[in-house]
C-alpha cells in the first residue's frame, strides 16, 4: 500500500514510525516548511516529521499551500493509495482529498465532535473534561467533520498535564492507525457519521490566555496551568525577594484556604483564587529550568503573586 504521510509536530512522529515499522511503503512526507529559530531568527529549524522522514530516506515536501494546481499535480503524481494526516497544519482542498485511491484519513486527539480544530488536547484539560480520546476519521472538506473509523477513550486524571496527555494519545494514535490501515487493506473498515449534537471547537491557544487570572475559581486556574503545560506555559508575576519577576507555572494541585486573589497563603506556595486556592507544584523562572516548589523556594521569599 502506497502511503503519503502528512504531519508536522512531535505528536505525529510515533504514528509515522509505526506505519514505516509495519512495512507500509511511505512514498512521501508532507510537513510544514522549516521555521526561523535562534535569537535572531537566522537559523531554520525543520519539523520533527521532516527529521524523522529524512532518517528513513523518505522524500519530504514542504509547500506553504496546497491550493495551487502545480502542488496538486505533484501530489497526484505520487499515486498514493491513502494519505494519513496527523496534525499537519494545512487545510486539504478537494483535489488533494480526492487524489489517493482510498482517500485521506486523519488522526485527531479528541472524541469528535467535541473539540474539532487546532488545540483539542489543551482545550479538553482547560475545560475540565474527565475524558477524551483518539480518533481515526476519513477526511472530508469540513473541519474535522468526517465519518469516524476507530476511537479509543482516555481518562483525564485530576492533575494530568497537556504534555502527559499528548504523549499518551500519540502512542494510542499509532496503534489505532495501524489497525485502521489493516482494516482498509482488508476492505473491512467501517465508517460511522459523527453525532450532530455536542459540537465544540478547539481554537488555537492565544498568548493572552497564558496569563493566570487569580480572580477565577481555583478549579479553573488549576485547569489552565495543567492545560498549558509544558507549552506555551501558564505564567504570572511574582514578587520574589522584593523584585517582580515573570514565572511560568508548570504544575499545580488544588489547595486549601481562602483569601484575596493572589494572596500567598503559606510557605508551600498555596495561592488564593477567586474561590478556593491552588498549590503551585512546579515553577520556572525566566532562563531557568522547571523546579519543584520546595527547590524553587530555596533562599527565596515570595510575598505577592500578581
Curated annotation (Swiss-Prot):
Annotated InterPro entries: Fmt, Formyl_trans_C, Formyl_trans_C_sf, Formyl_transf_N, Formyl_transf_N_sf, Formyl_transferase-like_C_sf, GART_AS, Met-tRNA-FMT_C
SUPFAM superfamilies: FMT C-terminal domain-like (SSF50486), Formyltransferase (SSF53328)
Reactions catalysed according to its record: L-methionyl-tRNA(fMet) + (6R)-10-formyltetrahydrofolate = N-formyl-L-methionyl-tRNA(fMet) + (6S)-5,6,7,8-tetrahydrofolate + H(+)
Pfam family, one: Formyl_trans_N
Entry's EC annotation: 2.1.2.9
PANTHER family membership: METHIONYL-TRNA FORMYLTRANSFERASE (PTHR11138), METHIONYL-TRNA FORMYLTRANSFERASE, MITOCHONDRIAL (PTHR11138:SF5)
Function: Attaches a formyl group to the free amino group of methionyl-tRNA(fMet). The formyl group appears to play a dual role in the initiator identity of N-formylmethionyl-tRNA by promoting its recognition by IF2 and preventing the misappropriation of this tRNA by the elongation apparatus.
Protein name: Methionyl-tRNA formyltransferase
Organism: Brucella melitensis biotype 2 (strain ATCC 23457)
Amino acid at each position: 500500500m502506497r502511503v503519503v504521510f502528512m504531519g508536522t509536530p512531535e505528536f505525529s512522529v510515533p504514528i509515522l514510525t509505526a506505519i514505516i515499522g509495519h512495512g507500509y511503503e511511505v512514498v512521501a512526507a508532507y510537513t510544514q516548511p522549516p521555521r526561523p529559530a535562534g535569537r535572531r531568527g537566522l537559523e531554520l529549524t525543520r519539523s520533527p516529521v521532516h527529521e524523522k522522514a529524512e532518517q528513513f530516506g523518505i522524500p519530504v515536501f514542504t509547500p506553504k499551500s496546497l491550493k495551487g494546481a502545480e502542488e496538486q499535480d505533484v501530489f497526484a503524481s505520487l499515486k498514493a493509495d491513502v494519505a494519513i494526516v496527523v496534525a499537519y497544519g494545512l487545510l486539504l482542498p478537494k483535489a488533494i482529498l480526492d487524489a489517493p485511491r482510498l482517500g485521506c484519513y486523519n488522526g485527531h486527539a479528541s472524541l469528535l465532535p467535541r473539540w474539532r480544530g487546532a488545540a483539542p488536547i489543551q482545550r479538553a484539560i482547560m475545560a475540565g473534561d474527565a475524558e477524551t480520546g483518539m480518533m481515526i476519521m476519513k477526511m472530508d472538506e469540513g473541519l474535522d467533520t468526517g465519518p469516524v473509523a476507530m476511537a479509543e477513550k482516555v481518562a483525564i486524571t485530576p492533575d494530568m498535564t497537556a504534555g502527559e496527555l499528548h504523549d499518551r494519545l500519540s502512542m494510542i494514535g499509532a496503534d489505532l492507525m495501524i489497525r485502521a490501515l489493516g482494516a482498509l487493506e482488508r476492505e473491512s473498515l467501517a465508517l460511522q457519521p459523527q453525532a450532530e449534537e455536542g459540537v465544540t471547537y478547539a481554537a488555537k491557544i492565544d498568548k493572552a490566555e497564558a496569563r493566570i487570572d487569580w480572580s477565577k475559581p481555583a478549579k479553573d486556574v488549576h485547569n489552565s496551568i495543567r492545560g498549558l503545560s509544558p507549552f506555551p506555559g501558564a505564567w504570572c508575576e511574582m514578587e520574589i525577594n522584593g523584585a517582580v519577576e515573570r514565572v511560568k507555572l508548570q504544575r499545580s494541585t488544588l489547595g486549601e484556604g481562602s483569601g484575596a486573589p493572589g494572596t500567598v497563603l503559606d510557605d508551600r506556595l498555596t495561592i488564593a483564587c477567586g474561590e478556593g486556592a491552588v498549590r503551585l507544584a512546579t515553577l520556572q523562572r525566566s532562563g531557568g529550568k522547571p523546579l519543584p516548589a520546595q527547590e524553587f523556594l530555596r533562599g527565596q521569599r515570595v510575598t505577592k503573586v500578581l
